[in-house]
Amino acid sequence: MFALKFASLFILAYLLGSFPAGVVVGKIFFYKDIRKYGSGNIGTTNTFRVLGPVAGIIVFLIDFFKGTLATLIPVIFNLGPHYLCLIFGLVAILGHAFPIFLKFKGGKAVATSAGFLLGYNVHFFLICAVIFIPILFITSMVSLTSLISVVLIFIASFFFHDIALSIISGLLVILIYWSHRSNIARIEKHQENMVPFGVVYWLKNKHTKSK
């Protein structure tokens, strides 16, 4: 009976992660398939660019909290040890990156990963936020910020003396870098999109205006 319950909830965590918020919001409220615009990604950043800030915030919140909810499934249903939260959270992240509803072509899983961290350890999540936000303000690029932050977060995980957390954080490094392959190529060519704030964005604008 426990095995059936575990398997059912495991699948639920994957399906939660697979829910394509960007595609659903785009099609229902804007009559657009977000995969055909901008970078073609279904996540928060492309939603902001293509559909605007309101849609972007909604998609971010859905992607974020589906990670949190999936991570808390073992707690909600009393499945056992706390480390199971890491496994269920990772399954949701993989669901976002490889959603069954979109033929396994999903997003970069940054927002869902953040939600997963909140669900597992609030203190660790706050440290991750302190790492991520200043780097974003400096680089003006969500992709570059994610690539830098995930490595620093992996290093920070060792200070929590939680081997399971460190292992999952290491897997996230691999997943985030893999899902950002096209972004890395654009960064190397100085062609990556920027958010409209931050040090690099302001310096670039200043340089452009001075020409």
Swiss-Prot record:
The chain crosses the membrane at residues 6-26, 57-77, 82-102, 124-144, 148-168. Its EC number is 2.3.1.275. It is found in: Cell membrane. InterPro entries: G3P_acylTferase_PlsY. Keywords: Cell membrane, Lipid biosynthesis, Lipid metabolism, Membrane, Phospholipid biosynthesis, Phospholipid metabolism, Transferase, Transmembrane, Transmembrane helix. Pathway: Lipid metabolism; phospholipid metabolism. It catalyses: an acyl phosphate + sn-glycerol 3-phosphate = a 1-acyl-sn-glycero-3-phosphate + phosphate. Probably interacts with PlsX. NCBIfam families: glycerol-3-phosphate 1-O-acyltransferase PlsY. Belongs to the PlsY family. Catalyzes the transfer of an acyl group from acyl-phosphate (acyl-PO(4)) to glycerol-3-phosphate (G3P) to form lysophosphatidic acid (LPA). This enzyme utilizes acyl-phosphate as fatty acyl donor, but not acyl-CoA or acyl-ACP. This is Glycerol-3-phosphate acyltransferase 2.
